[in-house]
């Protein structure tokens, strides 16, 4: 009988931590919509455009960082992503115009690409055994949802003690601090020399000729479209739609004392449900046909 390989390897644990921190920050941006717009008198559309640019940069950046990881190594790609992420947050903290905020959103978006699913899941998948791969990928994906669970409430809590600019600076420091765990992330390189020498154009042409890739691409597009809209606007929507939270009520008694805190908790609940769904999908993916399972989810 072959030796039983561990599910929770150092690569998986570090990968989960990096994704969790990265997505905690990303999921919190909707919390800042009202304070930033109120301070500078911006329109909601101006803030929304910055979030849209950030998501666009995240999408464009994922294949770029995938190529960087294959050329120079996963850990170096993650470092580049984290540095861009932190710089984008620091510059955004000093921005006073919508144009500046939108320009720096490109850096933040590319930073998310370098520290998010595209790079991390590839490393986790290579490091996992065949038996554990499906569950390892599910756990790493669920770590992103775990970041969403605490990211927005932490941002809202920090806003009660400091300005949104200082919260951005704090998040930038957290992004850089997570790099201290990188030495533990080592995974075998499986690409051969011919694959490494392929250009980005060749890889994209090959990918889009595969019907399975195209269907998965469209599925991710629909998922990302909805998720991006919810994380950007749902906290502000809840904050402005709900009436004041009265002392003695159920919400007040469990620590939710303002509508802005309720908006942050609403994002957390979505992330919590996502964790359950992701882990369930990972468990089911080991036992049932993945393509039919994915079709059923959509």
Residue ranges with predicted function:
Residues 29-33, 211-281:
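Extracytoplasmic gate region of multi-pass secondary transporters
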Residues 140-187:
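Helix-loop-helix hairpin linking two adjacent transmembrane segments in secondary transporters
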Residues 105-142:
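Cytoplasmic helix-loop-helix junction between adjacent transmembrane helices
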Residues 27, 55-63, 148-149, 271-279:
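Residue-level signature of mid-helix packing/kink "hotspots" within the transmembrane helices
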Residues 61-73, 277-289:
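Helix-to-loop junctions at the C-terminal end of transmembrane segments
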Residues 88, 99-107:
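Paired small-residue
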Residues 10-44, 62-65, 229-236, 244:
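Extracytoplasmic
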Residues 76-90, 292-298:
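Structural signature of the two symmetry-related core transmembrane helices
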């Amino acid at each position: 009988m072959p030796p039983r390989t561990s599910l929770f390897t150092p690569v998986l644990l570090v990968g989960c931590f990096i994704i969790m921190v990265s997505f905690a920050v990303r999921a919190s941006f909707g919390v800042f919509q009202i304070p930033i717009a109120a301070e500078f008198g911006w329109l909601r559309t101006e803030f929304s455009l910055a979030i849209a640019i950030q998501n666009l940069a995240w999408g464009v950046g994922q294949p770029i960082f995938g190529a960087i990881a294959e050329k120079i190594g996963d850990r170096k790609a993650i470092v580049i992503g984290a540095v861009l992420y932190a710089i984008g947050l620091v510059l955004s903290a000093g921005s006073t115009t919508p144009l500046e905020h939108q320009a720096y959103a490109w850096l933040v978006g590319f930073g998310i690409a370098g520290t998010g699913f595209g790079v991390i899941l590839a490393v986790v998948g290579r490091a996992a055994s065949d038996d554990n791969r499906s569950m390892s990928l599910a756990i790493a994906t669920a770590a992103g949802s775990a970041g969403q669970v605490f990211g927005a409430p932490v941002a809202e809590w920090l806003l009660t003690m400091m300005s949104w600019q200082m919260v951005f600076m704090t998040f930038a420091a957290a992004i850089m601090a997570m790099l201290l765990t990188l030495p533990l992330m080592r995974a075998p390189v499986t690409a051969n020399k011919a694959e490494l020498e392929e250009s980005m154009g060749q890889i994209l042409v090959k990918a889009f000729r595969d019907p399975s890739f195209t269907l998965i691409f469209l599925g991710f597009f629909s998922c990302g479209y909805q998720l991006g809209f919810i994380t950007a606007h749902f906290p502000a929507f809840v904050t402005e739609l709900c009436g004041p939270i009265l002392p003695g009520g159920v919400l007040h008694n469990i620590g939710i004392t303002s509508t802005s805190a309720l908006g942050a908790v609403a994002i957390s609940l979505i992330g919590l449900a996502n964790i359950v769904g992701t882990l369930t999908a990972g468990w089911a993916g080991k036992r049932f046909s993945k393509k039919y399972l994915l079709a059923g989810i959509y």
